[in-house]
Amino acid sequence: MLERISIGVAALVTAVLATFASAQAFDDAKYPDWKGAWDRIVPTWIQPGDKPAPLTAEYQAIYDASLAAQARGEPGNAPSTFCIPQGMPMMMTAFDPMEFVVTPDTTYLLISHVNDSYRRIYTDGRDWPRDFIPTYTGYSIGKWADPDNDGRYHTLEIETRELKTPRVFDITGLPMHKDGQTVVKERIYLDKADRNFLYDEITTIDHALTRPWTVTKKYRRLPSSRPNWISQVCAEANSYVRIHGEAYFLSADGYLMPMKKDQAPPDLRYFNPTRK
């Protein structure tokens, strides 16, 4: 018994010492100053200057149908309407404040969004896992780059795979392919002229696109060095229900309401009273 305890204590001490050594080796001055909270300062959809997504004919038709549905007041392909997490790459196009936590082996990206979204970006030189289960944020591996050759890191280059489907790019419902093979590459860096602005070059490689597609998102550092984060849970305000592919609105008194003109009622056969 004592031998087991000694082994356990030794393992714990080893882990603590390894963490301490890693922290000691972390040269904060070598990394860019991304402290504070960052907020989007342009629209949450494709911003001016970006070229339209080069969608295939099949997925352009899906996108057009989503835009038409939203024009009628329906949710279209927007996943957050039904409490589905935004995930990547949509979470990087949202308007919610975000915060970076940089460590030697991992950069954490915390986003003050519904369900408190976050990302882990591994920068420890690891390879891709063999049996990772796809998630909304995917699996991200990054590396720091020094494009100015001044001995300091300026850019975080990231590749994200293993994204759970269905997936859209932004709130307009721009669709990604359902095969789950989406790859998102990013380059995040500060504005050289004004360190209070941050850019994220997002390149999406996807079979719904005829070629890789790059857009650039811009963020502004918020004035407060101690921002207040608001925790939200989507279920608290979820008023939409999807049944057999059809969306319905849930009224304040708990009744299903149609989302469009002449919409057929949902099939509630299992709720019908049993006839004797």
Model regions and ranges:
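Hydrophobic helical h-region of N-terminal Sec-dependent signal peptides
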Residues: 10-20
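Hydrophobic small-molecule pocket/channel-lining residues, especially in calycin-type beta-barrels
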Residues: 2-6, 19-276
